[in-house]
């Protein structure tokens, strides 16, 4: 028998449902659509579609959606990344039926009124871009994805107004991605039977049939590349390593190792991240400082240390612990045989900031 904290997975009428029932009064409901930037037919269209979520639908205004949720003590949001557009609601457990209906209503009945694009959606998207551009680590990561994958995962996540997107483009893209086969429903603090019941009775069942875009996703990988971006402010040096799905366990352990005191230079790292996709993974680590010479010295130390063999087997338990907090993973991750890691010369490198003082890849 599964304990209350364990995951329950099931498939209902094409879409998948994953739940983790926990004690307490709070619940989180997520609808994850394989509609992130890697699937975009125009740069930034996934970001704009995400920003269209919780606008006016055919049955409720955007204001009514917000006010009803506030009265119930809940909140909703829509976010975008490279793999997903994610609709999320946080609420008291007893309000599960309302939020299942609210999220299904957004996917099925968003009205895409023409005036909302220039008046609400694009200004919000420009704000998102301005916030992201103020973060040099985000910019470095963006460069790494672009040189590592070019298209697909290398597409820009956020709308930058370079390529024009019309309301008809958004309608067409939404009809392609908002299908039964292309969504995953996750519940935390939610009973599986209850969630399945309310989902079955909701407009999720009225979504059209389509295809699971993730099943055909295949990334072309490029290694040994670098990119540089001059900007005012803090400087960042970042390393990116594309990872085959068979090596997810090893790099999950490496992420845990680099993020912990097990790695002697962990204090020099500003961010370590291992992101898993259905077909590939990507590990990045970054050094950031207001003084570019400090960044240069520290990234050389970190890369130099990693070019020596590191025993990462002692980080597997930490990696399993972190993995256990995730609601879902695109593949089964196994840690059998995780032992040593040694950085080879296939890594990619990005420098952002005062790049005249930052090293080139072949100087690491």
Swiss-Prot record:
It comes from the Eukaryota. Residues 1-15 form a transit peptide. Belongs to the peptidase M16 family. UQCRC2/QCR2 subfamily. Component of the ubiquinol-cytochrome c oxidoreductase (cytochrome b-c1 complex, complex III, CIII), a multisubunit enzyme composed of 3 respiratory subunits cytochrome b, cytochrome c1 and Rieske protein, 2 core protein subunits, and additional low-molecular weight protein subunits. The complex exists as an obligatory dimer and forms supercomplexes (SCs) in the inner mitochondrial membrane with cytochrome c oxidase (complex IV, CIV). Transmembrane segments: none annotated. GO terms for biological process: mitochondrial electron transport, ubiquinol to cytochrome c. InterPro entries: Metalloenz_LuxS/M16, MPP/UQCRC_Complex, Pept_M16_N, Peptidase_M16_C. It holds the Pfam family Peptidase_M16. One of its GO terms (cellular component) is mitochondrial crista. Component of the ubiquinol-cytochrome c oxidoreductase, a multisubunit transmembrane complex that is part of the mitochondrial electron transport chain which drives oxidative phosphorylation. This is Cytochrome b-c1 complex subunit 2, mitochondrial.
């Amino acid at each position: 028998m599964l304990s209350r904290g364990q995951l329950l997975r099931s498939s209902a009428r094409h879409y998948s449902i994953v739940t983790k029932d926990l004690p307490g009064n709070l619940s989180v409901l997520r609808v994850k659509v394989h509609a992130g930037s890697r699937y975009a037919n125009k740069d930034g269209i996934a970001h704009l579609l995400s920003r269209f979520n919780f606008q006016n639908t055919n049955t409720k205004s955007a204001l009514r959606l917000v006010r009803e949720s506030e009265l119930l003590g809940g909140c909703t949001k829509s976010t975008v990344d490279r793999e997903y557009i994610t609709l999320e609601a946080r609420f008291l457990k007893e309000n599960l039926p309302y939020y299942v209906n609210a999220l299904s209503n957004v996917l099925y009945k968003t009205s895409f009124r023409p005036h909302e694009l220039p008046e609400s959606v694009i200004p919000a998207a420009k704000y998102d871009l301005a916030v992201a551009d103020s973060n040099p680590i985000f910019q470095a990561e963006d460069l790494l994805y672009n040189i590592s994958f070019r298209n697909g995962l290398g597409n820009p996540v956020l709308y930058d107004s370079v390529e024009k997107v019309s309301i008809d483009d958004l309608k067409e893209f939404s009809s392609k991605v908002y299908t039964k086969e292309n969504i995953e429903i996750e519940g935390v603090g939610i009973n599986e039977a209850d969630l399945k019941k309310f989902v079955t009775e909701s407009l999720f069942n009225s979504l059209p049939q389509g295809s699971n875009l993730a099943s055909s996703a295949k990334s072309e990988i490029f290694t040994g590349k670098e990119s540089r971006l001059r900007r005012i402010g803090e400087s960042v040096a970042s390393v990116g390593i594309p990872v085959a799905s068979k090596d997810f366990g090893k790099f999950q352990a490496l992420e845990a190792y680099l993020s912990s005191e097990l790695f002697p230079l962990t204090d020099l790292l500003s961010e370590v991240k291992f992101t898993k996709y259905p077909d590939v993974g990507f590990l990045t680590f970054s050094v950031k400082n207001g003084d570019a010479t400090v960044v240069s010295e520290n990234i050389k130390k970190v890369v130099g240390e990693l070019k020596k063999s590191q025993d990462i087997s002692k980080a597997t338990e930490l990696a399993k612990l972190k993995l256990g907090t995730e609601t879902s993973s695109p593949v089964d991750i196994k840690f059998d045989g995780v032992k040593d890691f040694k950085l080879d010369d296939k890594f990619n490198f990005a420098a952002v900031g005062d790049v005249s003082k930052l090293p080139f890849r072949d100087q690491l």
